[in-house]
UniProtKB/Swiss-Prot annotation:
The reaction(s) this protein catalyses: Fe(II)-heme o + 2 A + H2O = Fe(II)-heme a + 2 AH2
Entries under PANTHER family matching the protein: CYTOCHROME C OXIDASE ASSEMBLY PROTEIN COX15, CYTOCHROME C OXIDASE ASSEMBLY PROTEIN COX15 HOMOLOG
Name used for this protein in its record: Heme A synthase
Subunit text: Interacts with CtaB.
Gene it is expressed from: ctaA
Regions that span the bilayer: 22-42, 107-127, 133-153, 172-192, 208-228, 269-289, 302-322, 324-344
Natural source organism: Bartonella tribocorum (strain CIP 105476 / IBS 506)
Function, as annotated: Catalyzes the conversion of heme O to heme A by two successive hydroxylations of the methyl group at C8. The first hydroxylation forms heme I, the second hydroxylation results in an unstable dihydroxymethyl group, which spontaneously dehydrates, resulting in the formyl group of heme A.
Amino acid sequence: MAVKRLNDNLLTPVQKRNRKQIQVWLYSILLLCLAIVLVGGATRLTGSGLSITEWKPIHGVIPPIGVEQWQEEFLKYQQITQYKLLNRDMTLSAFKVIFWWEWAHRVLGRLVGLVALLGLIWFWATKRIEKNILFPLIVVPILIAFQGFIGWWMVASGIGQSNLTSVSQYRLAFHLITACLVIIFVTYLSRGLTEYSEKPANQKVQCFAAWLVILVLIEIYLGALVAGLHAGKVYNTWPLMDGQIIPDGLLQHHPYWLNLFENPLTVQFIHRFFAYFLFIVSALHAFYVQKNAPHSTHSRRAFLIFFIIIIQAILGILTLLHEVPISLGLIHQSMALVVLCFAVAHWRATKGAYRAVE
């Protein structure tokens, strides 16, 4: 079996058609994943994540119907710590609001799983999948199913005998990162099916682009810890942190390493300064790509990513100064995903398209 680099002369019209159809399917999955994360962010910001205390993958699609079922669902919520300590005065009407956010988040998760699985079955049954991309495409629905399990594992941290009034920040961060890994994987696959007129960048540019993706992912993880600890509610000043560059109280927990994950002051401090680091690295990356691939699409993409990161930094500052209103919080989270998608697409484009197998 001969393997040749993909170009317009090697791909048959049928191969081109198949790749474009698979791309549409993958982009549909990607859009659904982005929507899920956005709704998940709203679920978190509105304190809705623990409103559904059971995991019913099939029957959970049907919401309560009638007053009796709603009362039954509300009674289940009243058994958890969040209700007992924070929401004792909550009415049924208020409960319905938080219920619908969590329900929408879960239903979207089921929908993207169905789209991924049914699409894979159809493309495989109609023999439209090339052998060299079959395994990666099989991994997509598996990753989505795993992410669904992680979502329930996260919710379980705040129900039952838990003393938490919200989900564990560790599990929240892990849940968001696994969602980002799905987004990275799908973006990488879909961009690999694109036909590029530009030749692949050199190995060093490809490596730098990959590291940029990793740094963006780390910053998103730190942002998830900030969200889980409500750390955006402290140090609502910029550029100084309540008048200091390095504020007091960063190492108040013992052992000291615990501050990295459980001290809201420390977590926000790290999130801020890692953002500065990412800003500098993205600038260096843009100029490095321009030097190694001058006036190329690789260079233009690198500067575009740098520009998007600037916008994201401004959004982060505004979100902090306004003490994380839901609107700005969601915009900031959404832009983080935009940065991630662009960084992954850029990285994949520096490598060229998937090879055509004859």
